[in-house]
């Protein structure tokens, strides 16, 4: 979990380094995402992971195929107009819930570990290279 914490911190440090008026500026992602949209995207997947972990803990989880593109579009549509302070708070709360749910599991679970990794450190690492570039582009 050291990677999860380190990458989470880097992601937020990069976003925090942006001037407030640039956090919502489109261009981070080709489809017009901003850094705020990225934080909302990450937070939404962390929230989804928290739900899955609760289902694993209660024995109601059933693995199923996920349409990632559809979920990404749904998350973006639902969070795009939310103010950045609320987006940030949602992401932090979702991460805390996910980690708390993971730690409350009575026994280890490969499926839980997979969700933690995919929603957390692997997901952060997927987005960090472009975020680093975007921060540099906006800083010029």
Predicted regions and their residues:
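Acidic/histidine-rich alpha-helical segments that form the ligand environment
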Residues: 71-111
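Short, charged, low-complexity loops and linkers
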Residues: 1-3, 31, 76-80
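Short hydrophobic/aromatic-rich motifs at helix boundaries and adjacent loops
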Residues: 7-8, 22-25, 67-72, 98
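Alpha-helical bundle segments that constitute or directly flank the non-heme di-iron/ferroxidase center
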Residues: 1-22, 44-54
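Hydrophobic packing residues in well-ordered alpha-helices of helical domains and bundles
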Residues: 1-8, 84-91, 117-120, 124
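Short, contiguous alpha-helical
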Residues: 25-70, 103-140
